[in-house]
C-alpha cells in the first residue's frame, strides 16, 4: 500500500508491505507536483497527441521509481494507493517509465482511506446483479446507443435483473434494492461526481439519483446483512477541477457499505467503456482474478485495440475500495 504525501518542500512516499514499512523522500515541492499533475491530466485527455508521455514519465520518476527495488524484492503485482488530495485527479495506471505504462506491470486500486477498505475477496453469488442503463436521450442528455449492448452483455454474464431506459426509474431502483440483496449493482448512464452534492448524481429515466438517494438505498441492502460487493458506474464523469470528485459517488457507496466501486475520472466513448466493462466481468467470472487484476486485464485488452490504444480511453477507470 502506498501513501504519497505532498508537503510544501518535498514529497514523502510511505510504503506498507505486510508488516514492513518503508519511507522515501523526493525533493519535489507541493506546488511543482500540483502543476505537473494538472499538466498530465490535461494532456492525457487529448486523444490526438502523445504529449502526455513527458509528464507521465516525470510523475513516474517521483511517485514509483524510488520504490522500484522494494516492490521487485517483494514480488508485488498490485499497488493500492491512498492518494494525497493533489493526486486524486489522475490515473496512476497511465504513469510511464520510459518503456511502458504502470498498467503493464501492476494492477492498481485506490483506497480513499484504510478505514473505508475491506480487503476480502469478492463473495460471488450467481444471479444477484442489478444491471441498469439509459441508452435513450432523456432530460436534455444525449443518447448512449452502446449502453443497451453493454447492459445486455453484462446481464448475460452475471445474470440477475436488467432494467433499461424507462424501466430504470428512481422508484424502481429503490424498490429493487429493497427487494433483492444484490451482489453487484451496475449503472450505465450519464452521471457526474463532484464535491458539491448538487453536482453529484446518476441519471435515471425520470430524474437524478443523488448521493443521498444512492447512500440510502445501498444502506438498506446492508441492513439486510447483505452488503453490496461491487458498484459500477459506467459512462459517468467527474466535475472538472474537483480534487475529490473521483471519489464522489464511489466514496458514498463505500461509506454506505459497498465494498468496492468502479468509476471513471472522465467521460469516454460508451462503446469503449462497454468493451472494457464486459472484459472486466469476464475476468471476474474466471474465478482466478482479483478485481484489480480483472481491471488490469480489461485495460490491457482495450489498449491493444488500435482504436483505443491512447490512455484517454482505458486509463480513467478507477477501482476504489476492496481490490481483491
Where are these regions (language model features)?
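Preference for extracellular/luminal or secreted protein segments
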Residues: 1-7, 11-16, 21, 110-113, ...
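Active-site-proximal beta-strand/loop segments in catalytic clefts of secreted hydrolases
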Residues: 5, 82-85, 132-136, 187-190, ...
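Catalytic cores of nucleophile-dependent amide-cleaving enzymes
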Residues: 112-115, 119, 183-279
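An often Trp-containing, charged/polar helix-loop segment at the C-terminal end
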Residues: 76, 273-324
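Catalytic-core domains of enzymes
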Residues: 18-19, 36, 74-75, 82-184, ...
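Residue-level detector of buried hydrophobic side-chain packing
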Residues: 13, 79-81, 90, 132, ...
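Domain-scale, conserved, charged regions that form catalytic cores
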Residues: 1-105, 117, 126
Amino acid at each position: 500500500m502506498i501513501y504519497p504525501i505532498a508537503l510544501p518542500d518535498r514529497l514523502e512516499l510511505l510504503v506498507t508491505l505486510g508488516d514492513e514499512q518503508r519511507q522515501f523522500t523526493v525533493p519535489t515541492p507541493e506546488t511543482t507536483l500540483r502543476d505537473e499533475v494538472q499538466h498530465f491530466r490535461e494532456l492525457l485527455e487529448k486523444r490526438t497527441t502523445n504529449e502526455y508521455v513527458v509528464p507521465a514519465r516525470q510523475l513516474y520518476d517521483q511517485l514509483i521509481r524510488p520504490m522500484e527495488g522494494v516492490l521487485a524484492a517483494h514480488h508485488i503485482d498490485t499497488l493500492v494507493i491512498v492518494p494525497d488530495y493533489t493526486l486524486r485527479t489522475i490515473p496512476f495506471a497511465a504513469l510511464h517509465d520510459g518503456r511502458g505504462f504502470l498498467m503493464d506491470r501492476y494492477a492498481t486500486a485506490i483506497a480513499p482511506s484504510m478505514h473505508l477498505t475491506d480487503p476480502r475477496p469478492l463473495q460471488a453469488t450467481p444471479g444477484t446483479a442489478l444491471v441498469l442503463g439509459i441508452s435513450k436521450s432523456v432530460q436534455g442528455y444525449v443518447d448512449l446507443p452502446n449502453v443497451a449492448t453493454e447492459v445486455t452483455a453484462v446481464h448475460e454474464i452475471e445474470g440477475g435483473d436488467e432494467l433499461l431506459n424507462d424501466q430504470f426509474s428512481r422508484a424502481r431502483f429503490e424498490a429493487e434494492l429493497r427487494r433483492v440483496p444484490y451482489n453487484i449493482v451496475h449503472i450505465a448512464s450519464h452521471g457526474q461526481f463532484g464535491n458539491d452534492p448538487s453536482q453529484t448524481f446518476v441519471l435515471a429515466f425520470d430524474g437524478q439519483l443523488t448521493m443521498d438517494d444512492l447512500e440510502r438505498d445501498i444502506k438498506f441492502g446492508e441492513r439486510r446483512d447483505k452488503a453490496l460487493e461491487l458498484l459500477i458506474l459506467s459512462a459517468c464523469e467527474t466535475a472538472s477541477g474537483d480534487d475529490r470528485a473521483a471519489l464522489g459517488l464511489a466514496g458514498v457507496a463505500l461509506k454506505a457499505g459497498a465494498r468496492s466501486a468502479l468509476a471513471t475520472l472522465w467521460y469516454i466513448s460508451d462503446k469503449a467503456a462497454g468493451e472494457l466493462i464486459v472484459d472486466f466481468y469476464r475476468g471476474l467470472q474466471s474465478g482466478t482474478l482479483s478485481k484489480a487484476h480483472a481491471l488490469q486485464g480489461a485495460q490491457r485488452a482495450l489498449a491493444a485495440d488500435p482504436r483505443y490504444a491512447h490512455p484517454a480511453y482505458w486509463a480513467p477507470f478507477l477501482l476504489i475500495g476492496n481490490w481483491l
